[in-house]
Each structure stands twice: as structure tokens, then as C-alpha cells.
């Protein structure tokens, strides 16, 4: 840690980058209607945006089970030639091992691209949280334009 330099400004310290996050309710509840143990109303969606195209690369799991965001990000980076301008991230739900995860990850990228007026293949997506739950897309549809 002796070679670490703390830079004021966080992720936005780098010229040309903007970031935002908010609570939209992804962590709110469980499918059985019970309150989620992680419902603490902390931010559960975030976006990072670059003013210009950036070189981007991914390091992916070798596990046979891959989360939908991993698959969609890998595809988008292949289509864009390794260029990205935005990252959309949610917490509280891993969007993994569910029936429509890939569709939801693609929709997160589409919503982000639309809000930022950039090509959808220049959006990468990440999710972290509980595995096996359906990702609620409505809170994300509401939140993305606000970020």
C-alpha cells in the first residue's frame, strides 16, 4: 500500500468522466413478498459515463455458469471493437441463474444508451447481489434517466 496515491474526486477525478448513483428499489423485496435483508435504502444503481470513446477490456470467469451481464458485456465489447463510453451497474440482484437475465441486461444497456445518446454496444453492464432472483426492470427503467 506504500505506492498507493489517494486522488481526491473519486472516479470523477479523471478528466471527461462523470458518475452518478441512487437508490431505486432493486434491493427492496424478495419474490415471496418478504422484506429483503439488504433493504437499507442505499444506492443500488450507478452509471459511469465518458465524454469520449475509451478502450475497454474484460476479464471473464472460466466458470460454466456465467451471469447475464458477463455475456452481454462480452458481446458488446466484441461488437464495439473494445470501445466503451458507459457502465451501468446494479446491486442487490446478480442477474444470474434466472430465466430472463440476458434480456434484462440488454435492456439495461439499451436504456443507458438511449439516455446518453450513444451506441448500445458502447455500454457495459454489471450486476452484483443475490443469485437466482428475477431482476426487477421497472425500477431500472425509472432510474436510468435520472442518473
Where are the regions a protein language model picked out?
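Short glycine/serine/threonine-rich phosphate/pyrophosphate-binding segments
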Residues: 79-81, 96-99
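Pocket-edge structural micro-motifs
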Residues: 49-51, 74, 91
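Short glycine-rich or small-residue beta-strand-to-loop segments that form or flank ligand, phosphate
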Residues: 86-98, 124-131
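Structural motif
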Residues: 44-47, 69, 85-89, 121-124
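N-terminal amphipathic/basic leader segments beginning at the initiator methionine
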Residues: 1-65
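Glycine-rich anion/phosphate-binding loops
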Residues: 62-71, 99-109
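Glycine-rich, mobile lid/loop segments that gate access to catalytic sites or pores
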Residues: 103-107, 111-147
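Glycine-rich oxoanion-binding loops at beta->alpha junctions
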Residues: 55-81
